[in-house]
């Protein structure tokens, strides 16, 4: 509180001390909160949001902490016991700031999931098991669709543009599988500037009607 000149300590480890074995000073590899990433206020400034992981970095929690008392709640978590989880997975809020698109590799492939801020999974947006998503290109809430790129054809270097409904239905590839694509979508989503190329073909810009 700037006016009052007071501070509040946020307990990112939920009461667990940083030195988990006091006699030796050894850190536990398993307790979440050793590393903290992407600290930012929620849209309504009611919570301080963050990603936090354990020292092994095979557990991730997206948490919201109250500024009044520093207590944290887990909104969602990811765990890969024998591997590693991305510390700061891409996410994108929808316009209501109560729903967000979360990127996860929980099934072994990078996919998109729609959550709300209570941590409820509304729906998987993609469920690919033979190729993975690159990232979200645009969310058109008026049309109820998400545009995203993926490595979905014979060569993983050929990035393609897809469209899927916010209900997770109607996934379709929009671009030519012969090329890799760098796309820009117009504000009204009616047109796409598509720069196509291969390792043998130089870049060519095209204007497409969605």
Predicted regions and their residues:
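Beta-propeller folds
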Residues: 1-208
């Amino acid at each position: 509180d700037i006016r009052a000149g007071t501070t509040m300590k946020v307990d990112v480890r939920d009461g667990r001390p940083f030195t988990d074995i006091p006699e030796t000073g050894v850190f536990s590899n398993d307790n979440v909160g050793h590393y903290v990433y992407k600290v930012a206020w929620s849209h309504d400034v009611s919570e301080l949001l963050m990603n936090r992981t354990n020292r092994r970095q095979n557990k991730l929690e997206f948490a919201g902490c109250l500024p009044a008392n520093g207590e944290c709640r887990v909104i969602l978590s990811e765990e890969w016991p024998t591997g590693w989880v991305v510390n700061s997975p891409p996410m994108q809020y929808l316009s209501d700031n109560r729903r967000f698109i979360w990127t996860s590799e929980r099934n072994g492939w990078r996919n998109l999931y729609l959550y709300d801020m209570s941590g409820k999974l509304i729906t998987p947006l993609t469920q690919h098991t033979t190729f993975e998503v690159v990232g979200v290109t645009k969310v058109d809430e008026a049309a109820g669709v998400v545009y995203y790129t993926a490595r979905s054809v014979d060569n993983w270097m050929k990035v393609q543009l897809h469209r899927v409904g916010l209900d997770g239905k109607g996934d379709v590839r929009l671009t030519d599988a012969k090329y890799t694509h760098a796309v820009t979508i117009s504000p009204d989503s009616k047109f796409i500037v598509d720069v196509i190329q291969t390792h043998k073909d130089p870049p060519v810009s095209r204007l497409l009607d969605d």
